[in-house]
């Protein structure tokens, strides 16, 4: 049957990582580093940069990951990176991670991680509802963007 018919993976299967884009096609990752801190294998590294004028359509917020790498030889596919991410930027998909013959090809950069705008990846089927609800709750400061910001009212005593 294989390769014509592939086996169905378990609902909790954790495979290829993806860096998601928002509805407008901008990258969600703000290089906050929480995924790297949460990673017990220390497989995630990144460098942040400031968004320049004219790049608003590319990056959702003022800070973004100019370099984002996952060392797939170190990754244990625990999923703590996606749980730690406050911006719903990184997810583990149901796709099998491709292998290679050299160590250098096992360090996945943004070229392999950022989802394409033409072929978005549905990651909702792997998520627990309580995680989805928590991440969408705008009362949590880390889920807000500059679009949600309200002016601070001044108290006149």
Question: What would you call each of these model-derived segments?
Answer:
Residues 1-50, 112-144, 154-157:
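Ferredoxin-type iron-sulfur electron-transfer modules and their immediate structural context
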Residues 54-157:
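Flanking helices and flexible, charged tails adjoining ferredoxin-like Fe-S electron-transfer domains
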């Amino acid at each position: 049957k294989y390769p014509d018919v592939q086996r169905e993976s378990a609902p909790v299967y954790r495979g290829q990582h993806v860096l998601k884009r928002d509805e407008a096609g901008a990258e969600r990752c703000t290089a906050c580093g929480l995924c790297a801190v949460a990673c017990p294998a220390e497989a995630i590294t990144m460098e942040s940069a400031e968004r320049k004028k004219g790049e608003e359509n590319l990056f959702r917020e003022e800070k973004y990951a100019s370099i984002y790498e996952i060392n797939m030889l170190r990754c244990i596919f625990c999923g703590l990176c996606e749980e730690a991410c406050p911006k719903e930027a990184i997810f583990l998909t149901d796709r099998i991670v491709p292998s290679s013959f050299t160590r250098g090809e096992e360090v996945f950069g943004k070229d392999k991680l950022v989802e394409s705008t033409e072929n978005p990846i549905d990651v909702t089927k792997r998520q627990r509802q309580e995680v989805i609800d928590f991440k969408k709750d705008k009362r949590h400061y880390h889920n807000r963007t500059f679009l949600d910001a309200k002016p601070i009212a001044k108290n006149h005593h």
